[in-house]
């Protein structure tokens, strides 16, 4: 609960694992436990989170049901089928959390989320209705032409690297996802299209997204070091 309203989490785990060299990143073992189990554990154990909607690729739904049962993830109230785009998958998860006042959206392939990020995200979202986890950029970012030539260097001090969770008042994110014909790379971008403010709160460098075998190895190292 947060501000006397239910809090729901959409865990998006319907990706194709194209860069994992044949492994399914969601069920790959991390310290002897599936990546997805690490991710769900953070939300299961969070005192703020009431309900979880888990979004899976169609072919992984039965396997997800087995995992939820094995680890007793009692807050998972729905296992939904994902869509072609990430947006379609999130929309599917949102439909299962209709009675929640606040929504967190998190990548299932980010297993090293710090538990404190959940209340911190909710507190940040309370100020304007939307908030996203982010970390400062470490590298210089340049804009290039279609021919691969550098056109300009972007001001790093005004740029951030965005992570999940992304946190929203439910009415805002539901309205954002009702719009069609807009392709976005993250949830906050749809809120931005509504001309509504989005705050940032501190993410963590350890909150990596597993997309390659090298990421999985790095997650193992971070986990052993206590992140």
Swiss-Prot record:
Molecular function in Gene Ontology: 2-C-methyl-D-erythritol 4-phosphate cytidylyltransferase activity
InterPro entries with a match to the protein in the record: IspD (IPR001228), IspD/TarI (IPR034683), IspD/TarI_cytidylyltransf_bact (IPR050088), ISPD_synthase_CS (IPR018294), Nucleotide-diphossugar_trans (IPR029044)
Transition state stabilizer (site feature) positions: 19, 25
Pathway membership: Isoprenoid biosynthesis; isopentenyl diphosphate biosynthesis via DXP pathway; isopentenyl diphosphate from 1-deoxy-D-xylulose 5-phosphate: step 2/6
Biological process according to GO: isopentenyl diphosphate biosynthetic process, methylerythritol 4-phosphate pathway
Site entry: Positions MEP for the nucleophilic attack: 156, 209
Entry keyword set: Isoprene biosynthesis, Nucleotidyltransferase, Transferase
Record-stated family: Belongs to the IspD/TarI cytidylyltransferase family. IspD subfamily.
Entries under HAMAP family matching the protein: IspD
Protein name listed in UniProt: 2-C-methyl-D-erythritol 4-phosphate cytidylyltransferase
Origin species: Dehalococcoides mccartyi (strain ATCC BAA-2100 / JCM 16839 / KCTC 5957 / BAV1)
Lineage, opening ranks: Bacteria, Bacillati, Chloroflexota, Dehalococcoidia, Dehalococcoidales
């Amino acid at each position: 609960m947060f501000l006397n309203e239910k809090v729901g989490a959409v865990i998006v785990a319907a990706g194709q694992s194209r860069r994992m060299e044949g492994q399914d990143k969601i069920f790959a073992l991390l310290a002897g436990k599936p990546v997805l189990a690490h991710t769900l554990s953070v939300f299961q154990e969070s005192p703020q989170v009431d309900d979880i909607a888990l979004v899976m690729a169609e072919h992984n739904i039965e396997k997800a049901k087995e995992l939820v049962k094995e680890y007793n993830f009692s807050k998972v109230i729905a296992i939904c089928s994902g869509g072609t785009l990430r947006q379609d998958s999130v929309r599917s998860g949102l439909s299962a959390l209709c009675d929640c006042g606040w929504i967190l959206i998190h990548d299932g392939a980010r297993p090293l989320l710090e538990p404190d990020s959940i209340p911190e995200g909710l507190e940040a979202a309370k100020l304007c209705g939307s908030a996203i986890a982010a970390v400062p950029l470490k590298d210089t970012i340049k804009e290039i032409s279609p021919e691969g030539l550098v056109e300009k260097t972007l001001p790093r001090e005004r740029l951030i690297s965005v992570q999940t969770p992304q946190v929203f008042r439910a009415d805002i994110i539901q309205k954002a996802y009702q719009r069609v014909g807009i392709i976005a790379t993250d949830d906050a971008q749809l809120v931005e299209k509504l001309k509504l403010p989005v705050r940032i709160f501190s993410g963590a460098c350890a909150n990596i997204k597993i997309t390659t075998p090298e990421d999985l190895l790095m997650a193992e190292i971070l986990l052993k070091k206590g992140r």
